[in-house]
């Protein structure tokens, strides 16, 4: 079924995509993108809550937008570490369209519904999106997609991974770059 009974309308001329649902403090919290493929300044990340993972979700509005440190406010990824909650996001840059991409993160409030800290500097990118963060042992792993997508057999889209001893990076591959 649909996550929302009615699509959030606080950001006009956008589409809904890239959901990330997490169980936080007894509630299901949905982070989602409202964006426009050709208008990165319109991209935002919203947050919604439900008692059930299948919804319906109650929208709590905008969490991040292009004024939050990046014009590519898409592809949210929730991560919790040592009792702290974080949201990672970001995507490609496009100098031809006048914006810089990359991956950033911010610390969230205890309930995950608002921003607690300052937005990080770019920790990965500029050509990576759809990331997922995982911790194993003493390392943080950042998985993401890179390459050209949506070109059928000519697509070079693939998954890459980098690791770091710190959540803020740098995330490097096995060759150290």
Question: Language-model features: where?
Answer:
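Carbohydrate-active catalytic/glycan-binding domains of CAZyme proteins
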Residues: 1-177
């Amino acid at each position: 079924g649909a996550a929302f009974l009615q699509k959030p309308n606080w950001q006009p001329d956008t589409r809904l995509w890239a959901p990330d649902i997490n169980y936080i403090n007894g509630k299901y919290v949905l982070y989602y993108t409202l964006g426009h493929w050709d208008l990165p300044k319109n991209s935002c990340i919203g947050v919604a809550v439900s008692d059930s993972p299948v919804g319906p979700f109650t929208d709590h509005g905008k969490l991040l937008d292009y004024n939050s440190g990046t014009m590519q406010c898409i592809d949210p990824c929730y991560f919790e570490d040592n009792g702290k909650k974080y949201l990672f996001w970001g995507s490609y840059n496009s100098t031809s369209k006048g914006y810089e991409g990359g991956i950033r993160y911010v610390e969230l409030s205890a309930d995950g519904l608002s921003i607690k800290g300052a937005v990080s500097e770019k920790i990965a990118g500029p050509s990576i999106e759809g990331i997922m963060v995982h911790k194993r042992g003493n390392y943080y792993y950042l998985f993401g997609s890179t390459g050209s997508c949506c070109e059928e057999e000519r697509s070079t889209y693939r998954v890459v991974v980098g690791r770091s001893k710190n959540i803020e990076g740098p995330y490097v591959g096995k060759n150290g770059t």
